[in-house]
């Protein structure tokens, strides 16, 4: 039984703290008619309000995504990439500023792992709708390099995360003995104020350091973890999700990986594997948001941060093209780039390790533009699946 929650912000969505778990299982048979005939699609959706622990992913439930995944079906399938979380969950009941409940955190992404220290990668970024923030991107565009790890948190914690990263650089000699340096940490955000006491400012330096310390390769957690802990997506619980694709260009095998912090969209637009399930589920576990009478919030407002990693040798202008394909994956599952949404994306390549050189001319490799279609397709597919994984 699901009991109604009398909290002033959210009803019917109880605490996301364990051990309270809501499993919504809906088996829907949809008949889709087009010029080629009638297709019957059997779809199983399981949305689990969990913070940690073993849980199924979208493919485990039989959702038929397109494309071949890497070993972990994660951004960490791209060699060298490490991801870490700090997850902050505390309290229940009514939202009281400064007291909670707390549902927030920090996500850290290291393109070449934290042991590499200062090791810039070619990168570029793109914003579908800019009602949000990703710091450091003006220098990414200007220089063509991502020089720092990528951090993701909630809207009100961008500053503390940025400052903590800079302090960590000093404490760990990130620049390996250089006496004079400057940099612009890349910190992105989405708004978790519906499930989190966001104006209590609960993210602290210690949480940033924890996310950094926890960064590792291999299998990574999804859902209510890291910066995604308090996020909502397409009418249900959102959070952190990841996926990857492995493909060939001529005789070489490459990988594209995606990680998302998903906090966007209206339930009516939810689509899974091409099936418009949001229409069928429009009356399933609807929450009530008791906004002030003059609130300008519209259904579908929210944000999504997407980071794409690849080992394909790409130059910054080509990575811009990759970042511009990310919205196609977001749109497949129901994103519309609403006015109140911060849809901000960044793509980087781990190839060309010696490309950054302050003093000497360097020689780099780049894939021909005519060969990029598999990279585009892999990007769209990985983003689509990562978003659904964030909701499972």
Describe the residue ranges of each PLM region.
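Alpha/propeptide regions of enzymes that mature by internal proteolysis
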Residues: 54-392
